[in-house]
């Protein structure tokens, strides 16, 4: 698949029918389906990696760093916070959000390819994450389940499943009426979502994160690399901690 074909695939709206596809939809870092961990999201802790000599504790912080990569003093200060942050949720809420007005004006031009590059570096640089991704069945459709998220990009990076949402909401009301506490209700919802109800409904959205993960997984399996647009990233002049990154190297997993 060439770079343009990959971009078209990446931004295409999808409708994954859970009744006919082997959907591995992740929402939380502790999700488990068919005995396999779904700790695949950017926010998940514990999968640190180096990106051209700079260590990040999680891929969310590395991704956000690209939005503030003009090399200005303000951007350097933000990046220093991101490098030491070990919590992707905190980075998004407490580091990115307050400085949203300072992000690069051309961010949307290269952010998808930057995410692909970041996740690929995570695959190359963290063996535990790499093996986790490779453990997902070959016929699985990896999906970011953002059904209960309200953000404008919920169905860009992820998907929504309205039928499953209704089932889970009805279950919550039923269990609440029985006097079950909030934590117990959530556990029961997760159990059904990842088990008996995993084949319910249709996941709709672009699912960029799921597609990027599947693309990286396939590259690892084939001993190749994803169709990263290195020319676009090089042209973006991405600076990290005072160093402009270069994108002319081809690296495979060890």
Summary of predicted features, one role per range:
Residues 1-254:
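Charged, low-complexity intrinsically disordered segments
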């Amino acid at each position: 698949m060439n770079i343009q074909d990959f971009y078209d695939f990446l931004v295409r709206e999808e409708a994954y029918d859970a009744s006919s596809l082997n959907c591995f939809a992740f929402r939380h870092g502790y999700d488990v389906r068919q005995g396999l961990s779904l700790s695949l999201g950017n926010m998940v802790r514990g999968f640190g990696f180096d990106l051209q000599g700079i260590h990040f504790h999680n891929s969310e912080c590395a991704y956000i760093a690209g939005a503030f990569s003009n090399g200005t003093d303000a951007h350097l200060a933000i990046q220093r916070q991101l490098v030491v942050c070990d919590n992707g949720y905190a980075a998004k809420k407490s580091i990115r959000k307050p400085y949203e007005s300072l992000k690069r004006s051309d961010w949307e031009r290269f952010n998808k390819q930057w995410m692909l590059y970041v996740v690929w570096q995570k695959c190359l640089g963290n063996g535990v994450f790499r093996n986790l991704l490779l453990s997902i069945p070959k016929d699985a459709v990896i999906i970011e389940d953002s059904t209960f998220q309200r953000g404008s990009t919920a169905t860009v990076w992820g998907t929504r499943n309205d039928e499953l949402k209704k089932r889970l909401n009805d279950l919550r009301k039923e269990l609440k009426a029985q006097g079950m506490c909030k934590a117990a209700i959530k556990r029961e919802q997760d159990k059904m979502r990842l088990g008996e109800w995993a084949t319910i409904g249709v996941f709709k959205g672009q699912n960029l994160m799921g597609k990027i993960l599947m693309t990286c997984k396939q590259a690892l399996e084939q001993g190749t690399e994803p169709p990263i647009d290195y020319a676009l990233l090089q042209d973006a002049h991405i600076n990290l901690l005072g160093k402009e990154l270069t994108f002319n190297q081809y690296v495979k997993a060890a």
